[in-house]
Amino acid sequence: MLIPSKLSRPVRLNNTVLRERLLIRLNESSNYRLVLITSPAGYGKTTLVSQWAAGQDNLGWYSLDESDNQPERFASYLIAALQQATQGHCVKSEVLAQKHQYANLPALFAQLFIELSEWRRPIFLVIDDYHLIVNNMIHEAMRFFLRHQPENLTLTILSRNLPSLGVANLRVREQLLEIDSQQLAFDYQETQQFFDKRLTTSLDADDCKRLCNEVAGWATALQLIALSARQSCDAAELSAKRLSGINAGHLSDYLVDEVLNQVGSSTREFLLRSSILRSMNDGLIVRLTGEENGQQRLEETERQGLFIQRMDDSGEWFRFHPLFASFLRQRCQWEMALQLPELHRAAAEGWLAQGYPGEAIHHALAAGDTAMLRDILLQHAWSLFNHSELSLLEECMNALPYEQLLESPRLVLLQAWLAQSQHRYSEVNTLLNQAEQALQQKQIAIEPDLLAEFDALRAQVAMNSGKPEMADKLAKQALAALLPQNEYSRIVATSVEGEVLHCRGELADALARMQQTEQLARRFHVHHYALWALLQQSEILLAQGYLQTAYETQNKAFELIREQHLEQLPMHEFLLRIRSQLLWCWSRLDEAEEAARRGLEVLSNFQPQQQLQCLTQLAKCSLTRGDIDNARRYLARCENLLSNGQYHRDWRTNTDKLRVIIWQSMDDKSAAIRWLAQTERPESVSNHFNQGQWRNIARAQILLGLYDEAESILDTLNQHARELQLISDLNRNLLLCNLLYWHIGRKSEAQSALIEALSLANRTGFISHFVIEGELMAQQLRQLIQLNTLSELELHRAQRILRDINRQHRHKFAHFDESFVTQLLTHPDVPELIRNSPLTQREWQVLGLIYSGYSNDQIAAELDVATTTIKTHIRNLYQKLGIANRQEAIQQAQQLMQMMGLGV
């Protein structure tokens, strides 16, 4: 819940001096990306900008305090301020900020700028007191903000010092408007106006000039002089002399003598008590001071000129001038040290009564009242956790003595979930085990439903650690003891059960459990678990061979992401990745590539290690097109990631599949030998992870001529795939059986395996799995078509596969990889002119791309060089091959294709 006063423009008071010379400059602010107003405290930064803001419609205001160093809090308020400026235009960004569903601040700002790009009018965002930000993460995010903000947005920052935002570049590009303390200082005319508005008896011009010179136009000093001048002109002179040369750091003594000691005891006590509040209203003042009418007291203090200012048009919220607030807090610590804890407790109660647990926690921490902190957490911690207030909760956990945690074991559970949510998996069991042991020693009984919640969390940790049997046991224990109100833990335990069943190959039960998880998660609005359940359903359906149903389930997941604004969660990449994998199966390669690239965009704000699966997908698409060079480039990136991170078996298996197929196409037996010597061999074959890894092993063995070992593996895989109805794995296994039987001369069995694979493909829709087997597959399909034994559907699929294999070979030729050129030059029928031609590898590539119908610009884009460079290559190859134009080049390439047995 956001505090309204932090998003309210300060109210422009009637007796303020209109800073016309500075307002003229600010009226040009729409021509700049950044307006930077810097000065020490008390020079009128906020007052000036509030005067200017009064005439602006599309303006948002964000007043900072120390708590805004939490990135999540900063983001929520900043987006809320821009929502005010745009009348609620940035709905998606607001939801992301409220639910903390973004990778980091730059990722959130990127989404914000997409929405703001549709807003055509000028926008102004004011951030006051930026000097309070000391979190480098926020500074870095604001540097990103300044680099990428829309042209129609102007950011205005008020700060006591130069912020760490890299403004030098903006200054050079004349996109920075700066106002500093010298310009903010009052001139003679403004000083005269200032005193005329505050004093019943006017000062003459010479006196005003002298007073202005004495304090160098410092607005706060002028205000203090005005307070003294109400007593006598001599008092004003004495104040001016005393303030001459003083700065904010040495103002305390003056404020004690000339302000605090000049007010009545009740006002003094009111000022000191209320100083602990960062913002205040009637209810908070009543709670803190015991006065019956807090609003009346606030307005009276304002009339006395005691450095208090309204924060909104309604006059409900007030705050002290920052300089005076700092002074009062310091005096409160000295004069009311013994009462201070009680004051903070009262403030915490006041904030709780108004529905702001975050502010209440701030005061409970300041009071050092861990019992109160514990009580607040017991009431509000899970709400804060579900709103991703993780850093605030972590601070609370660190402040609570361990003994108090044990007195409230549900807070131990919260502490463990904090570790889990921050991926500190190894700490979770340690925290829970230590707590259970300590509670047993103290003979404190743990409620059965709480133990069940412990087990649900432990089950998730066990699943993350690759221990499905332990996870299953814990999940079952949890579900048996959880109460109806333990919704979150029930969702977790049900999901874990579904994952375990999936790993065992019990796909029908796994699907039912994941559908149950989705229903529970949707009912209780735990949207990220609903998304997780849909992703798991898609994977299970794909394993069952129901790819069309998996595709439709993915559509439901995309819809959930759009509805709940989950685009920046890593699970969005998971969805895009499995969509890419499914589209690849169907040989919809352009769409598969697009999905993988979108997945990489989602991951742009995360560690590069997470890119492995999407890069593998891009490599598979290149491989299926016949562009083996590009596939190898992607594979090199994958191998670099594998060497620098720990990955789930499924991830490694996918990349290993790519490796082995490339080694097969290049007859790289030495690489296969090295890999076989060190690769893991899963204990079971009951799920698609393990089936895939054993297929990789069998393919490597076929490459090395280890046919008996490969056949033994494939027999085992097929037996389990048939028993468990792992239809997609059976489809893949049969294609590998076909390869094996062909190599060992069992042509009849090879044909039977291929026919069954084509039959299963009627259900799975597989195309690319056939295509990557290359010319050997094409040869067998041609024979099957000639036999005229295929059904109409299977015949259509076989013809489609043949076309794609043909296109794959054409692509290989178009790119003229080195192995193809070597084969061509050693062909006995190659013309002497070609054999003796000094064509470079790049010129061969250009010739192939000309044949494929590429224009000069397209060739340049494909090879990532300038068009002029391509023209030079074309001129050279024409000269070397004795041809005159593009048509002759195409004819020459076609003759070479036919000579190599590629009938295109």
From Swiss-Prot:
Binding site for ATP: 39-46
GO biological process, one term: positive regulation of carbohydrate metabolic process
DNA-binding region: 856-875
Single GO MF annotation: DNA binding
HTH luxR-type domain boundaries: 832-897
Activity regulation (UniProt): Activated by ATP and maltotriose, which are both required for DNA binding.
The entry's keywords: Activator, ATP-binding, Carbohydrate metabolism, DNA-binding, Nucleotide-binding, Transcription, Transcription regulation
Family matches, as Pfam families: GerE, TPR_MalT
InterPro entries per UniProt: P-loop_NTPase, Sig_transdc_resp-reg_C-effctor, TPR-like_helical_dom_sf, TPR_MalT, Tscrpt_reg_HTH_MalT, Tscrpt_reg_LuxR_C, WH-like_DNA-bd_sf
Binding partners and assembly: Monomer in solution. Oligomerizes to an active state in the presence of the positive effectors ATP and maltotriose.
Family indicated by similarity: Belongs to the MalT family.
Functional note: Positively regulates the transcription of the maltose regulon whose gene products are responsible for uptake and catabolism of malto-oligosaccharides. Specifically binds to the promoter region of its target genes, recognizing a short DNA motif called the MalT box.
Entries under NCBIfam families matching the protein: PRK04841.1
Protein name: HTH-type transcriptional regulator MalT
Native source organism of the sequence: Photorhabdus laumondii subsp. laumondii (strain DSM 15139 / CIP 105565 / TT01) (Photorhabdus luminescens subsp. laumondii)
Lineage of the species this protein comes from: Bacteria, Pseudomonadati, Pseudomonadota, Gammaproteobacteria, Enterobacterales
Gene: malT
